[in-house]
Amino acid sequence: MSNQNGKTKLITDNRQARFLYEILETYEAGIELTGTEVKSIRAGRINLKDGYALIRNGEAWLINVHISPYEASGQYFNHDPRRTRKLLLHRKEINKLIGQVEQKGLTLVPLKMYFKDSWVKVSIGLAQGKKLHDKRETLKRRQDERDMQRAMKRW
């Protein structure tokens, strides 16, 4: 996510995905949204925690991401909060992802959502699930780093 092509503004970050999965590669994807979804995203009412992506019929889909209904519009014009949304990727990227997801048993996880200029983008990670001992190791390493920082602060 470089700032060379335009301004970027982070909307939400899926920190739990980085704890539960080992991220091997990341991809930037556009996302197909309705007007009320964009307004809710601008208000910051989105949750990526339970989301994942699938490749179906040669297209990428973002599933189970919760975008709260826009409060200013009525119920009739609003969207379904957990609807399946289409991801916009290049054909080469989709073909590469199909091979890696099917052969290696990897997962596609949304890592963050941000505005790039006026477009909503999703950073998708090709991920491999961590084992319990890997998660414990991560927690231990994090705690050790905190302890070292506290010790350095005292000096």
UniProtKB/Swiss-Prot annotation:
Which Gene3D superfamilies does this entry report, sorted A to Z?
2.40.280.10
What does the record list as GO biological process?
A: trans-translation
The set of disulfide-linked cysteines is: none
PROSITE patterns assigned: SSRP (PS01317)
Cell location: Cytoplasm
Principal location listed in the UniProt entry: cytoplasm
Q: What keywords were assigned to this record?
A: Cytoplasm, RNA-binding
Establish whether keyword Cytoplasm is in the entry: yes
Any one GO MF term held by the record is:
RNA binding
Q: Which GO terms describe its cellular component?
A: cytosol
- Pfam families cross-referenced by the UniProt entry: SmpB
> Transcription regulation among the record's keywords?
no
Q: HAMAP family recorded for this chain?
A: SmpB
Its annotated function is as follows: Required for rescue of stalled ribosomes mediated by trans-translation. Binds to transfer-messenger RNA (tmRNA), required for stable association of tmRNA with ribosomes. tmRNA and SmpB together mimic tRNA shape, replacing the anticodon stem-loop with SmpB. tmRNA is encoded by the ssrA gene; the 2 termini fold to resemble tRNA(Ala) and it encodes a 'tag peptide', a short internal open reading frame. During trans-translation Ala-aminoacylated tmRNA acts like a tRNA, entering the A-site of stalled ribosomes, displacing the stalled mRNA.
Its family remark reads: Belongs to the SmpB family.
Protein name per Swiss-Prot or TrEMBL: SsrA-binding protein
Source organism of this protein record: Gloeothece citriformis (strain PCC 7424) (Cyanothece sp. (strain PCC 7424))
